[in-house]
């Protein structure tokens, strides 16, 4: 026994570091994924805050027309953003040392690439850390699987879409108005609202919100009261208690009578799997949709209008969408293009008579 203790005490500094990193007794679990996650997320967060406050305007379109995004250059919380890296840089890796000066790096939107690449690495490591902690505690791995949905969505808009379009300047700006601008331009160029994978994502997000509200309200309404009427029902719960805290039979009976019997789960495990799977699968599909539209496999288009026997156009909702898309397309990057791509791709009429 004494020999064992002596060996433990003489363990190397590296061994003690490994034990500390992988210990589940720490207040916050670090883990090997955390060793990479902590510096990358700290870097992304620090640069984001500094750039959001003080970054100079960025030549996003590569046409020597810088766009301001920071608070000190005239923006507020709503209009401010980290402007994406310039189209002049394209998909090139653009760290600070690749620029002739820090001023040039800022002018070409270097902070955007720095933030996005560190952020994506950081959230991927956060997902790995979730799996790692689950593994150490003997839990099942589905927490990390669920988190893969928002990781996939972030990767789609910040990395896959710029790769497909050929430039980080097409990535989503890091700000409120910038996000909306990205959505509007995406609709104009890819007709995302008519893409079935986006529709599945909408069903996932809105359906998940509905199911979450239904589940929470049902459980809260069917608590087993352990207190008097003069006390909060919450006071009757003890953390770690063996007894059920709510009556699933009562909740099942209520919901089964509200709609019909088979609309209500009578198995708690099936119910919670459904609550997790519905929004996760929906967001997976949306990320997949963004990733395919990145390479211009777009949503349904109805460019051929419905016509009557005389050749007259019968206007439909599709015609209104097409007109709206063209309007949005001509408004964005208005100094970089003379015509939207849809109009410019049509063969020019003959001028020789």
Swiss-Prot record:
<keyword id="KW-0106">Calcium</keyword>
<keyword id="KW-0460">Magnesium</keyword>
<feature type="binding site">
    <location>
        <position position="344"/>
    </location>
    <ligand>
        <name>[CaMn4O5] cluster</name>
    </ligand>
</feature>
<feature type="modified residue" description="Phosphothreonine">
    <location>
        <position position="2"/>
    </location>
</feature>
<dbReference type="InterPro" id="IPR005867">
    <property type="entry name" value="PSII_D1"/>
</dbReference>
<dbReference type="GO" id="GO:0009635">
    <property type="term" value="P:response to herbicide"/>
</dbReference>
<feature type="transmembrane region" description="Helical">
    <location>
        <begin position="29"/>
        <end position="46"/>
    </location>
</feature>
<keyword id="KW-0602">Photosynthesis</keyword>
<dbReference type="GO" id="GO:0016682">
    <property type="term" value="F:oxidoreductase activity, acting on diphenols and related substances as donors, oxygen as acceptor"/>
</dbReference>
<keyword id="KW-0560">Oxidoreductase</keyword>
<feature type="site" description="Tyrosine radical intermediate">
    <location>
        <position position="161"/>
    </location>
</feature>
<dbReference type="InterPro" id="IPR000484">
    <property type="entry name" value="Photo_RC_L/M"/>
</dbReference>
<dbReference type="Pfam" id="PF00124">
    <property type="entry name" value="Photo_RC"/>
</dbReference>
<dbReference type="GO" id="GO:0005506">
    <property type="term" value="F:iron ion binding"/>
</dbReference>
<feature type="binding site" description="axial binding residue">
    <location>
        <position position="198"/>
    </location>
    <ligand>
        <name>chlorophyll a PD1</name>
    </ligand>
</feature>
<keyword id="KW-0007">Acetylation</keyword>
<keyword id="KW-1133">Transmembrane helix</keyword>
<keyword id="KW-0408">Iron</keyword>
<keyword id="KW-0934">Plastid</keyword>
<keyword id="KW-0479">Metal-binding</keyword>
<dbReference type="GO" id="GO:0010242">
    <property type="term" value="F:oxygen evolving activity"/>
</dbReference>
<feature type="transmembrane region" description="Helical">
    <location>
        <begin position="118"/>
        <end position="133"/>
    </location>
</feature>
<feature type="binding site">
    <location>
        <position position="170"/>
    </location>
    <ligand>
        <name>[CaMn4O5] cluster</name>
    </ligand>
</feature>
<feature type="transmembrane region" description="Helical">
    <location>
        <begin position="142"/>
        <end position="156"/>
    </location>
</feature>
<comment type="similarity">
    <text>Belongs to the reaction center PufL/M/PsbA/D family.</text>
</comment>
<dbReference type="GO" id="GO:0016168">
    <property type="term" value="F:chlorophyll binding"/>
</dbReference>
<keyword id="KW-0157">Chromophore</keyword>
<keyword id="KW-0604">Photosystem II</keyword>
<dbReference type="GO" id="GO:0009523">
    <property type="term" value="C:photosystem II"/>
</dbReference>
<feature type="binding site">
    <location>
        <position position="332"/>
    </location>
    <ligand>
        <name>[CaMn4O5] cluster</name>
    </ligand>
</feature>
<keyword id="KW-0359">Herbicide resistance</keyword>
<feature type="binding site">
    <location>
        <begin position="264"/>
        <end position="265"/>
    </location>
    <ligand>
        <name>a quinone</name>
    </ligand>
</feature>
<feature type="binding site" description="axial binding residue">
    <location>
        <position position="118"/>
    </location>
    <ligand>
        <name>chlorophyll a ChlzD1</name>
    </ligand>
</feature>
<keyword id="KW-0813">Transport</keyword>
<feature type="binding site">
    <location>
        <position position="215"/>
    </location>
    <ligand>
        <name>a quinone</name>
    </ligand>
</feature>
<feature type="site" description="Cleavage; by CTPA">
    <location>
        <begin position="344"/>
        <end position="345"/>
    </location>
</feature>
<feature type="binding site">
    <location>
        <position position="342"/>
    </location>
    <ligand>
        <name>[CaMn4O5] cluster</name>
    </ligand>
</feature>
<keyword id="KW-0150">Chloroplast</keyword>
<dbReference type="GO" id="GO:0009535">
    <property type="term" value="C:chloroplast thylakoid membrane"/>
</dbReference>
<keyword id="KW-0472">Membrane</keyword>
<dbReference type="GO" id="GO:0045156">
    <property type="term" value="F:electron transporter, transferring electrons within the cyclic electron transport pathway of photosynthesis activity"/>
</dbReference>
<feature type="modified residue" description="N-acetylthreonine">
    <location>
        <position position="2"/>
    </location>
</feature>
């Amino acid at each position: 026994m004494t020999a064992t203790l002596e060996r433990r005490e003489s363990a190397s500094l590296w061994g003690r570091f490994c034990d500390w990193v992988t210990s589940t007794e720490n207040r916050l679990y670090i883990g090997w994924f955390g060793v990479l996650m902590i510096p990358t997320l700290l870097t992304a967060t620090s640069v984001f805050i500094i750039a959001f406050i003080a970054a100079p305007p960025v030549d996003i379109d590569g046409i020597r027309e810088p766009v301001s995004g920071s608070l000190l250059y005239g923006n507020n919380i709503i209009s401010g953003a980290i402007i994406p890296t310039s189209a002049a840089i394209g998909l090139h890796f653009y760290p600070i040392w690749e620029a002739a000066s820090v001023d040039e790096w800022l002018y070409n939107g270097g902070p955007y690439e720095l933030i996005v690449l560190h952020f994506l690495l950081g959230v991927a490591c956060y997902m790995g850390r979730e799996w790692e902690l689950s593994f150490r505690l003997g839990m099942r791995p589905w927490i990390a699987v669920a988190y893969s949905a928002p990781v996939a969505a972030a990767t789609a808009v910040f990395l896959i879409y710029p790769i497909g379009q050929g430039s980080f300047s097409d990535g989503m700006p890091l700000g409120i108005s910038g996000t909306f601008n990205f959505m509007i331009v995406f609709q104009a160029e890819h007709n995302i609202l008519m893409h079935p994978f986006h529709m599945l994502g909408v069903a996932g997000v809105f359906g998940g919100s509905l199911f979450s509200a239904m589940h929470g309200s049902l459980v809260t309404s069917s608590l087993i009261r352990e207190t008097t009427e003069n006390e909060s029902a919450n006071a009757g719960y003890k953390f770690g208690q063996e007894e059920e805290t709510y009556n699933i039979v009562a909740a099942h009976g209520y919901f089964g009578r509200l709609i019909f019997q088979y609309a209500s789960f009578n198995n708690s495990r099936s119910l919670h799997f459904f609550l997790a799977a519905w929004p996760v699968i929906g967001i997976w599909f949306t990320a997949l949709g963004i990733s395919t539209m990145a390479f211009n496999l777009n949503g349904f288009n109805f460019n051929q209008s419905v016509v009557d026997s005389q050749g007259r156009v019968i206007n439909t909702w599709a015609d209104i969408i097409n007109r709206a898309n063209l309007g949005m397309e001509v408004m964005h990057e208005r100094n970089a293009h003379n015509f939207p791509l849809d109009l410019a791709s049509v063969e020019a009429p003959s001028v020789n008579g």
